[in-house]
Amino acid sequence: MEALPQIRQTLSEIDRRIPDALRVAMGLRLRPTAGAALEEVTRIAASCLPRPCPEGGDDPMECDEAAPARALRMEAASCFLPDHDEDTHFVRPEAGVVALADGVGGYRAPGVDAAAFARALMYNAFEMVVATTPGGAGGICPYALLGWAYEQAVSARTQGASTAVILSLAGATLKYAYIGDSAFAVFRDGKLFFRSEAQVHSFNYPFQLSVKNGNSVTSAARGGVEVKEGDVVVAGTDGLFDNVTSEELQRIVAMGRALGLSPKQTADVVAGFAYEASTTMGRDTPFSLESRKKQGTIFRRGKRDDITVVVAYIV
């Protein structure tokens, strides 16, 4: 796990990447030097956010004609902010594949590496992706890849348990397979287009893969989402989605695209926002709202956790 000074350095680097316009739009703290230019920054922020559609109709500025079909690919990058250092992931844009896993903290104990199963899943999946010849019409099957990676981890009697998400771009289809509360979302024209649904047994108890006492790969959600050029895919562990709402994520993605941020810059900004939300008291988050709904708690704060964010631009 990274030492606290390293984490602070990472967050400082992320902080420098966040434009003041994004800070205003998202309610983040402005840098001290930005106060004098607040009015101008606010104006820029408003102009960058997506325009609302008229009630009962589509945006009149949208063209009715479909763009000509062409081969799609992804440009992807990631950001990882460790807490217990139990998340792991890989990004392989040349193969059109990104994946992440979150080791279940409930296995944390002396002599037990709670991250072991997650790391085994991602290592096995990555090795198979690297060994697979790219260019097949159907692309890589995320469900088959998850199943193979799981079987290898079970055969090795790997300790721990893990949630996981694997995404693969095949033509104009983003194929997916996931288990548990690690999730992904697709944004189109500055708006949420698709969001995966968390698989949980009960509050804070997600579906998970393990050698024993876990769920089977057959429990994984799988399918495909039709994507097009300009779409943005954001995948993350629960450290992201427990602390950032879909609406907040939508605004960050829209602002990032309007400001021309790269996938890496967007991933950094999203992770930085999630970290700030996870450490801020007196602020409702998806985690606190769900806890209030399911357990009757009254706290208003985020959830400290590893935060993994993968951002892919469809181009």
Curated annotation (Swiss-Prot):
Keywords: Hydrolase, Magnesium, Manganese, Metal-binding, Protein phosphatase. SUPFAM superfamilies: PP2C-like. InterPro entries: PPM-type-like_dom_sf, PPM-type_phosphatase-like_dom, PPTC7. Residues 71-314 form the PPM-type phosphatase domain. Mn(2+) 2 binds at residues 102, 238, 305. PROSITE patterns: PPM_2. Its EC number is 3.1.3.16. Mn(2+) 1 binds at residues 102-103. Its cofactor is Mg(2+); Mn(2+). It is an enzyme of class 3 (hydrolase). The keyword Magnesium applies. Gene3D superfamilies: PPM-type phosphatase domain. GO terms for molecular function: metal ion binding; protein serine/threonine phosphatase activity. It catalyses: O-phospho-L-seryl-[protein] + H2O = L-seryl-[protein] + phosphate; O-phospho-L-threonyl-[protein] + H2O = L-threonyl-[protein] + phosphate. Belongs to the PP2C family. This is Putative protein phosphatase 2C 24.
